[in-house]
Regions:
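Short helices/loops that flank or line small-molecule/ion binding pockets
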Residues: 10-22, 37-38, 71, 159-168, ...
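Periplasmic binding protein-like
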Residues: 17, 166-219
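A bilobed periplasmic-binding-protein/Venus flytrap-type ligand-binding module shared by bacterial periplasmic
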Residues: 46-75, 79, 88-89, 262-263
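Extracellular/periplasmic solute-recognition and catalytic clefts
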Residues: 3-60
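Long beta-strand-rich cores associated with HINT superfamily self-processing modules
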Residues: 269-286
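Append "and occasionally in soluble cytosolic enzymes with long acidic Gly/Pro-rich linkers
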Residues: 67-167
């Protein structure tokens, strides 16, 4: 018999696990309300599908519209120190990924992923001849990175990315919008008044990316619909042997740039559940 307990916060779950009769708990380390566990426990990491990425505004951005700065777009992956982001802003509890597939997935290729890892010199080389739009005074414009400021980890990550890009020669600022700013993050996304954005979504267990690339897809911000990539998504869903090609095409294209994948943490009282093998959709799986 499994008895479920209700809780109103991550801290309450943690406290009841540590000091009361709760034997099993699940936590999301990417959550702002994450609470650290400090007792004796057994721990499982379960891939969650939570996906943090950079999206490019290919339709309206002065940096990228009309096919501008393809080399810059494709080189953004080399400017991202993913492990530094995870260590600084996600408590070291996430998986760095250069591909739109979690490293814990059977569809992930380490050899392919290594081609798109942090390489600042390669990024600097790629942007030497980039187009930089000017304002009415003839001054170079900053690249603007949109972020949802209601998520503190994502906000800190965006500020770090802007600083890193600036240090590498691409002057970048942040656009910080959320529920407390009057104008919401989604309103700015819909308006298209940004150059790149730091997004987060939850992908299915099959890593279906079709909502990024289908016409009017729920994740196709910035006009990134692409029939070639959409068809490759369908081919991967039909035959898992095609995920390598899909991941390569998405990484080479650069309209979405993976940063990291999250995972759930499943805690159990030591010795209580020796044969537990939790999955993302069933924490009680034996």
């Amino acid at each position: 018999v499994i008895t479920l307990s209700e809780a109103t916060s991550q801290a309450q779950v943690r406290d009841e696990f540590e000091f009361a009769d709760l034997d099993l708990a699940i936590s999301n380390p990417m959550s702002d309300s994450y609470a650290e566990y400090r007792c004796d426990y057994e721990l499982w990491e379960v891939e969650s599908g939570l996906f943090l990425y950079i999206g490019v505004n290919a339709l309206w951005s002065e940096f990228f519209k009309d096919g501008r700065n393809d080399e810059l777009r494709k080189a953004l992956t080399y400017a991202i120190d993913r492990q530094a982001i995870i260590d600084a802003y996600y408590r070291g509890r996430a998986y760095p990924s250069t591909l739109p597939t979690s490293p814990g997935s059977p569809y992930y290729s380490e050899s392919l992923a290594s081609r798109y890892e942090y390489d600042p010199l390669r990024f600097v080389s790629a942007i030497q001849n980039m187009y930089v739009p000017k304002n009415d005074k003839g001054e170079a414009k900053k690249l603007l990175l949109l972020v949802n400021c209601d998520d503190s980890a994502r906000l800190r990550t965006a500020r770090y990315l802007a600083k890193q890009l600036t240090e590498l020669g691409l002057e970048t600022g942040t656009l910080e919008y959320g529920g407390s700013t009057g104008t919401t993050y989604e309103q700015v996304l819909r308006a298209g008044s940004y150059d790149i954005y730091l997004g987060q979504t939850k992908l299915s267990a099959t890593y279906d990316l079709s909502q990024f690339f289908k016409g009017y897809g729920n994740l196709g911000w910035g006009g990134i619909a692409d029939n070639t990539l959409l068809n490759m998504c369908k081919e991967a869903l039909a035959n898992s042997g095609n995920y390598y090609n899909l991941n390569k095409m998405v990484a080479d294209d650069g309209k979405i740039v993976p940063v990291l994948f999250g995972y759930y943490e499943v805690y159990a009282e030591r010795g209580q559940l020796l044969d537990l093998t939790p999955s993302r959709d069933n924490v009680f799986f034996y």
